C-alpha cells in the first residue's frame, strides 16, 4: 500500500480544556486507560508468516507538550495553528509493530486553555471505542476511575468468540455465520460492485486515500421536518437521509443498482459495552432502483433492507470480500466506494471540577472511500456533519455540489414522496426555469441565402477567382457556374425533377463537386455513395434511396439491381454544349431536403438522414463565421463524399469566396503523400479525423503559422491534442452527429488544457439531460441533446426511429431536439466534455471501460507510434486487447511485453490494462478515416505475455507457482497469467504474500505485487529478496508471542505500511491458543 493508506486508518479527536489543568493527572489518566484496555497495548507483527496482534505489557504512553502561548493573543490565529498542528499529528505515520497505537499531544494556548490531541489507529480502536477512551480518560482525571470499574471484556476475547473459538463456546455460532453467508450471497447476487461517480480527475492506478471534507448541516427546523415525516411513515430519519443520499449517488453515477457501505457498531452483546478495540463492521446495503421506485417506495425499501443488514452484520468484511471475490481493484475500495452514517453527536462537552472540556473531530485529511456522508444528531435537534471526499478524484466545488443536491432531494422527499427517483430534480430550479440550463451558441448575425444561390452570387462578384481544383483540372467561379448549369440541364433531361433524389457514386474531384451542385441547381436531392464501399452496402443505399438518376463513372459497371437511370459523370459534367440554353432554375424551399446522408445503423442496414437546405445553409453560415473563412483561404478536402463532414470541405470555401483543393482518396492512406499535400503552397485549412492527423504527424508534417486545423469525426485522444496544440496551427476540435448537420460544437485546442468539445456553434443550443429530458447539474453525466436550425428533417422512411430520436423540445414550443445518444458532462467552466456513448457502454469484469483512455496510455509507451484498443468477446469472456504500431524492432526484445504491461499498470487502473497485446503494421481505418475497431481482432502478431500459458522454468518460478496452485486450487499456472484473473482476490493475495515470506524468505510489498501480479514478476522479486533474515518469534513474560528483531519498514505505517486494513487477514494471539484470524473492515 502507499503511505496514505496507513494514515487513512486513523482516528483523531481534539479536546479543548479551559481552566486549571493538572498535567500530571492528565498523563496518569491516559496511562491508566492504556493499561486497562489490552487493545491499546497491541501491536501488529509478522509471526511465522502471519500478521499477528501482539499484546505487550508495561506499555507507557507519552504526552508531549507544545507551547503555543507565544504565538499572540489573536484567538483566530491560535485556532488556525491548533488545527494545523492537529492535521499534522493526525497524518503522522504509525509503527504498527510498536504499541501503543494511541498517542497524545498537549498544546498550551494559555495558562487556562490547553488543547489535547488524541490519535488512535483503527486497527485497535473504532469510533465507539474512542468514546469509551474519552469517557474513562476524564473519569480517571477526576480521580473516580471508570464507572463500574470491573475488568472489561478484552478485545482478544471478543475475537476468539467472534471466530468460534473453543475458549468461549457458542453453540449457535456456526449456524449464525452460515446464515450470514447465505444472506449476503443472496442479497448481493448480481449487484454491481463499482459505482462510477463523475470525477474531476482520472482515477489513479492506486487508491490514494487523500481526502477532504465539506460541511453538511440541517438546521433544527429542517431536521424536525425530516423526523416528523419519517415518524408518520413508520421509518427512521436514518433511512430518509440515506434515501436522499442514495438518490444523489444514483443520479450522479448513472446507476440504478448500487451498494452503500454502512458502519455498524457490532456490539449487540451487553458484555461488549465497555470493550475497546475494532469491533465495528462495515456492511453493504443494496439500493435497487431498477424499477424506478418513488421516493417513498425507496425509503420503505431501504428501511426493510436495513433489517437484514443489521441481523447479519457480524460477518466480518474481509470474509464478505472472500465470499464475493470481487475483481481486483487496487484503485478503489472493494465492494463499495461510498459510505453513510448517522449517530448521536458525541462531540459534547463535560464540566469537570475547575475544567470545561469541549470535544471536536479532527479532519485527518484522508478518505477511505470515494465519498462518505457522516451526520450527527445534535442536542438542539439540528443534524450536522460532513461529506468526506477523495481529493484525488473530486474538487471541493464538486463535493459542495453533491451536498447541495442532498438538500434538494430531501426537500422533494418531504414535499412529494410520490415522485419517481428518475424524476427527481437535482438542479432544484424546477421546470419553469430549466430553459436556463441550455447552453446557447448565440444568434446568427443575419440569414443567408441557400447554398447554390450564395455561390452564384459570389461568382457574379468574383468570376475569375479559383473555385475548385483537383490533380487534373481547376475551375474559376464563372466556369464552375457554367458547368453546373450544363450538368443540371442534363440531369433534368435524364429524368431528375424537383424533389427527386440523385445518387452520385464517383471519385472525389472537380467532377464530383459539379455533380453535387447540379443536383441542387436542378431542384433535386443529393445522395452521395462511396465507390470504395463494399458492393452490398452500395446496393443497400441505392435500394433505400431509390434515386431517379445515378451519376457514376461507368453506367455499365454499376450494381445490377438498381432501377435508376445511370449517367456517366464524365458526360454529365462536361462543358456546356454549343448553343445550349440555361435551364429554368427551380426555387427549392428552405425546408426541402438538400441531401440524404447514409450512416451506419445498429441493425446493420445503413440509415438515411434527410438534411434540409436551411439546415445546410445555417450550418455553413455559423461555422465559416466562427472560423473566419474568406476569399484568401484554400481548403484541402480529404474526406470521402459519403461522410457528411466532406460538405464543409467542399462548400465552406465556395460560400465564402475561397478555393477547394480536392485530394484523391489515396491521400488518406499514404502518410508521405498526405504530408506533402498538406504542405502544398497556399493551403490554409484542412479537416480530418484524429486518425488521419496522427498519420500526417507521423510523416513529419508540421503546419505553418496561420494554418487552420479542424479535427473531428471521433473522440480526440489527449495525447494527439497535445501534439496538435504544440504546433503553430489554430487547431479546433469539432463535434456533431449527421442528424444535426455536420458540426454542432467546437473547441479551440490549446496547450495544457483538457480535451473538450467546447461550446455550441452560433445558432445551436444544447442540453445535457437525463432520460426524462430533465437538465442535469454541471459535472453530472447525461445525454447531449442538440437543438436549433441544424436539427435535420429525420430518417428516410422510418417515422418510428425519427420520432424516437427527434423529440419535441419541452422548453421551446414548436421546436425539436435531437437525442444524440452521446454521454457528456458540462464542466464548471461551461465547456462540454465528451464521455462516451449511451448505447455502447463497454464493461469488462464490472468496470466501465473508456477505450480512448487506454489508447492514450498505449501511445505513450516507448517506441509506440500509434495504437488502438478494443474489447474482445464482450458478451462472454470479455477482455481488452491493445494493438500497437511501433518503431522497427521496438517490440521484438525478450520480455518487452511484460515491460509494456508494467508501464501500462503505472498509467492505468488495473481494470483497464489490456490482457492481450498485438503488434500491427498499421491501425485499420474505415473509409471515413475513423479507426475501424471491427477490423482489429485477428490482426497482428500476439506479443508474449498475454494470457497464453508459459510454464515455470526457474526454481523460483516453480516455487511461486506451487503456492499459487495451492491457494487458487489449480493444477497448474503459467508464469505470465494474472493472479486475479485466475480467481484470486485481496485476501488470498495477503495469504500469498505471507506464505512467500514464511516459505521463501521474501517480503514482497503489496503495491509491487498489485502492479504486476504474475508468477514471473514475483519469482524475480523473490530471487532478489531471498537473502532476507527470518525473524524468530519468542514469548513475552505473559506468554504472548513477540518478535525480537527490529520491525522492518513493511511493518511500519508511514514508513512503508504494506497492509490495507479493509482486506488483510490479521490474527490475535492470546495465552495458550493458536493465532485466530481476524477480518477488519474500513
Curated annotation (Swiss-Prot):
Keyword set includes Plastid: no
Pfam families noted in UniProt: AMP-binding, AMP-binding_C, Condensation, PP-binding
Reaction catalysed by this enzyme: holo-[peptidyl-carrier protein] + glycine + ATP = glycyl-[peptidyl-carrier protein] + AMP + diphosphate
Pathway, per record: Antibiotic biosynthesis
Source species, domain of life: Bacteria
Gene knockout outcome: Inactivation of the gene completely abolishes the ability to produce SFM-A.
EC number in record: 6.2.1.66
Biased composition (Basic and acidic residues): 1037-1055
Molecular function per GO: 2,3-dihydroxybenzoate-serine ligase activity; phosphopantetheine binding
PANTHER family the record matches: FATTY ACID SYNTHASE (PTHR45527:SF1), NONRIBOSOMAL PEPTIDE SYNTHETASE (PTHR45527)
NCBIfam families in the cross-refs: AA-adenyl-dom
Protein name, per record: Nonribosomal peptide synthase SfmB
Amino acid at each position: 500500500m502507499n503511505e496514505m493508506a496507513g494514515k487513512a486508518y486513523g482516528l483523531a479527536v481534539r479536546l479543548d480544556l479551559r481552566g486549571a489543568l493538572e498535567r500530571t493527572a492528565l498523563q496518569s489518566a491516559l496511562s491508566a486507560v492504556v493499561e486497562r484496555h489490552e487493545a491499546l497495548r497491541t501491536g501488529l507483527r509478522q509471526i511465522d508468516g502471519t500478521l499477528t496482534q501482539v499484546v505487550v505489557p508495561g506499555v507507557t504512553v507519552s504526552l508531549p507538550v507544545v507551547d503555543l502561548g507565544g504565538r499572540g493573543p489573536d484567538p483566530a490565529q491560535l485556532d488556525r495553528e491548533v488545527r494545523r498542528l492537529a492535521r499534522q499529528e493526525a497524518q503522522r505515520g504509525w509503527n504498527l509493530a510498536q504499541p501503543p497505537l494511541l498517542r497524545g499531544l498537549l498544546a498550551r494556548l494559555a495558562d487556562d486553555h490547553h488543547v489535547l490531541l488524541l490519535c488512535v489507529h483503527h486497527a485497535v480502536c473504532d469510533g465507539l471505542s474512542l468514546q469509551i477512551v474519552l469517557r474513562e480518560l476524564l473519569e480517571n482525571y477526576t480521580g473516580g476511575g471508570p464507572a463500574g470499574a470491573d475488568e472489561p471484556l478484552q478485545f482478544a476475547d471478543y475475537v476468539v468468540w467472534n471466530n468460534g473459538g473453543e475458549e468461549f463456546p457458542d453453540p449457535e455460532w456456526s449456524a449464525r455465520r452460515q446464515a450470514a453467508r447465505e444472506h449476503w450471497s443472496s442479497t448481493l447476487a448480481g449487484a454491481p460492485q463499482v459505482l462510477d461517480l463523475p470525477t474531476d480527475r482520472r482515477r489513479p492506478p492506486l487508491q490514494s486515500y487523500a481526502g477532504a471534507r465539506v460541511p453538511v448541516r440541517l438546521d433544527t427546523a429542517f431536521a424536525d421536518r425530516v423526523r416528523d415525516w419519517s415518524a408518520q411513515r413508520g421509518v427512521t430519519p436514518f433511512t430518509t437521509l440515506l434515501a436522499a443520499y442514495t438518490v444523489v449517488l444514483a443520479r450522479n453515477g448513472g446507476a440504478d443498482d448500487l451498494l452503500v457501505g454502512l458502519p455498524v457498531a457490532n456490539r449487540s452483546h451487553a458484555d461488549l459495552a465497555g470493550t475497546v478495540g475494532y469491533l465495528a463492521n462495515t456492511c453493504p446495503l443494496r439500493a435497487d432502483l431498477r424499477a424506478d421506485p418513488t421516493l417513498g417506495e425507496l425509503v420503505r425499501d431501504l428501511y426493510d433492507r436495513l433489517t437484514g443488514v443489521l441481523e447479519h452484520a457480524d460477518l466480518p468484511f474481509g470474509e464478505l470480500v472472500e465470499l464475493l471475490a470481487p475483481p481486483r481493484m487496487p484503485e478503489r475500495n472493494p465492494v463499495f466506494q461510498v459510505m453513510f452514517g448517522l449517530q448521536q453527536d458525541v462531540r459534547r462537552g463535560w464540566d469537570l471540577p475547575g475544567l470545561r472540556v469541549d470535544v471536536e473531530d479532527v479532519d485527518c485529511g484522508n478518505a477511505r472511500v470515494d465519498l462518505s456522508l457522516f451526520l450527527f444528531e445534535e442536542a438542539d435537534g439540528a443534524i450536522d456533519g460532513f461529506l468526506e471526499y477523495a481529493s484525488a478524484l473530486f474538487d471541493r466545488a464538486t463535493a459542495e455540489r453533491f451536498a447541495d443536491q442532498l438538500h434538494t432531494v430531501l426537500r422533494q422527499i418531504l414535499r412529494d414522496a410520490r415522485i419517481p427517483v428518475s424524476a427527481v430534480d437535482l438542479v432544484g430550479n424546477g421546470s419553469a426555469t430549466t430553459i436556463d440550463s441550455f447552453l446557447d451558441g448565440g444568434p446568427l448575425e443575419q440569414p443567408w441565402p441557400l447554398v447554390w444561390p450564395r455561390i452564384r452570387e459570389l461568382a457574379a462578384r468574383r468570376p475569375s477567382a479559383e473555385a475548385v481544383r483537383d490533380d487534373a483540372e481547376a475551375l474559376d467561379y464563372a466556369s464552375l457556374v457554367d458547368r453546373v448549369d450544363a450538368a443540371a440541364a442534363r440531369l433534368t433531361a435524364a429524368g431528375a425533377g424537383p424533389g427527386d433524389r440523385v445518387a452520385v457514386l464517383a471519385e472525389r474531384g472537380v467532377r464530383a463537386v459539379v455533380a453535387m451542385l447540379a443536383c441542387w441547381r436542378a431542384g433535386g436531392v443529393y445522395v452521395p455513395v462511396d465507390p470504395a464501399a463494399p458492393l452490398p452496402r452500395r446496393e443497400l443505399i441505392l435500394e433505400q434511396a431509390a434515386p431517379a438518376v445515378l451519376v457514376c463513372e461507368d453506367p455499365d459497371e454499376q450494381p445490377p439491381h438498381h432501377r435508376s437511370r445511370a449517367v456517366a459523370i464524365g458526360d454529365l459534367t462536361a462543358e456546356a454544349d454549343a448553343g445550349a440554353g440555361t435551364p429554368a432554375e427551380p426555387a427549392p424551399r428552405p425546408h426541402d431536403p438538400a441531401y440524404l446522408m447514409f450512416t451506419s445503423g445498429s441493425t446493420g442496414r445503413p440509415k438515411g438522414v434527410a438534411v434540409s437546405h436551411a439546415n445546410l445553409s445555417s450550418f455553413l453560415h455559423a461555422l465559416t463565421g466562427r472560423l473566419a473563412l474568406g476569399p484568401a483561404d484554400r481548403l484541402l478536402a480529404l474526406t470521402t463524399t459519403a461522410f457528411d463532414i466532406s460538405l464543409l470541405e467542399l462548400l465552406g470555401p465556395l460560400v465564402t469566396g475561397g478555393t477547394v483543393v480536392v485530394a484523391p482518396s489515396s491521400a488518406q492512406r499514404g502518410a508521405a503523400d498526405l504530408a506533402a499535400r498538406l504542405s502544398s503552397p497556399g493551403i490554409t485549412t484542412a479537416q480530418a479525423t484524429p486518425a488521419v492527423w496522427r498519420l500526417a504527424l507521423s510523416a513529419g508534417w508540421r503546419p505553418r503559422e496561420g494554418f487552420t486545423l479542424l479535427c473531428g469525426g471521433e473522440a480526440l485522444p489527449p495525447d494527439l491534442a497535445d501534439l496538435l496544440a504544440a504546433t503553430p496551427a489554430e487547431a479546433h476540435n469539432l463535434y456533431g452527429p449527421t442528424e444535426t448537420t455536420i458540426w454542432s460544437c467546437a473547441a479551440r485546442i490549446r496547450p495544457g488544457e483538457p480535451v473538450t468539445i467546447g461550446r455550441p456553434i452560433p445558432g445551436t443550443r444544447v442540453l445535457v439531460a437525463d432520460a426524462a429530458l430533465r437538465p442535469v447539474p454541471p459535472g453530472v453525466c447525461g445525454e447531449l441533446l442538440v437543438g436549433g436550425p441544424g436539427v435535420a428533417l429525420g430518417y428516410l422512411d422510418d417515422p418510428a426511429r425519427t420520432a424516437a430520436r427527434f423529440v419535441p423540445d419541452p422548453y421551446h414550443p414548436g421546436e425539436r431536439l435531437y437525442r444524440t445518444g452521446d454521454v457528456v458532462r458540462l464542466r464548471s467552466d461551461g465547456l462540454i466534455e465528451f464521455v462516451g456513448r449511451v448505447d455502447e457502454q463497454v464493461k469488462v469484469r464490472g468496470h466501465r471501460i473508456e477505450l480512448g483512455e487506454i489508447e492514450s496510455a498505449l501511445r505513450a509507451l516507448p517506441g509506440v507510434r500509434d495504437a488502438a484498443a478494443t474489447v474482445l468477446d464482450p458478451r462472454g469472456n470479455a477482455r481488452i486487447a491493445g494493438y500497437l504500431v511501433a518503431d522497427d524492432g521496438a517490440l521484438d526484445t525478450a520480455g518487452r511485453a511484460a515491460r509494456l504491461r508494467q508501464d501500462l499498470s503505472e498509467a492505468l487502473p488495473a481494470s483497464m490494462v489490456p490482457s492481450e497485446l498485438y503488434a500491427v503494421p498499421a491501425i485499420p481505418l474505415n473509409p471515413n478515416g475513423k479507426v475501424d475497431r471491427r477490423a482489429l481482432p485477428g490482426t497482428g502478431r500476439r506479443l508474449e505475455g498475454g494470457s497464453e500459458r508459459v510454464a515455470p522454468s526457474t526454481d523460483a518460478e516453480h516455487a511461486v507457482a506451487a503456492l499459487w496452485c495451492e491457494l487458487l486450487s489449480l493444477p497448474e499456472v503459467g508464469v505470465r497469467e494474472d493472479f486475479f484473473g485466475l480467481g484470486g482476490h485481496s485476501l488470498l493475495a495477503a495469504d500469498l504474500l505471507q506464505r512467500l515470506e514464511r516459505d521463501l524468505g521474501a517480503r514482497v510489498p503489496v503495491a509491487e505485487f498489485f502492479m504486476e501480479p504474475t508468477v514471473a514478476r514475483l519469482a524475480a522479486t523473490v530471487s532478489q529478496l531471498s537473502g532476507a533474515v527470518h525473524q524468530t518469534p519468542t514469548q513475552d513474560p505473559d506468554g504472548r508471542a513477540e518478535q525480537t528483531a527490529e520491525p522492518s519498514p513493511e511493518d511500519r505505517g508511514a514508513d512503508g505500511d504494506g497492509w490495507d486494513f479493509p482486506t488483510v487477514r490479521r490474527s490475535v494471539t492470546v495465552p495458550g491458543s493458536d493465532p485466530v484470524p481476524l477480518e477488519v473492515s474500513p
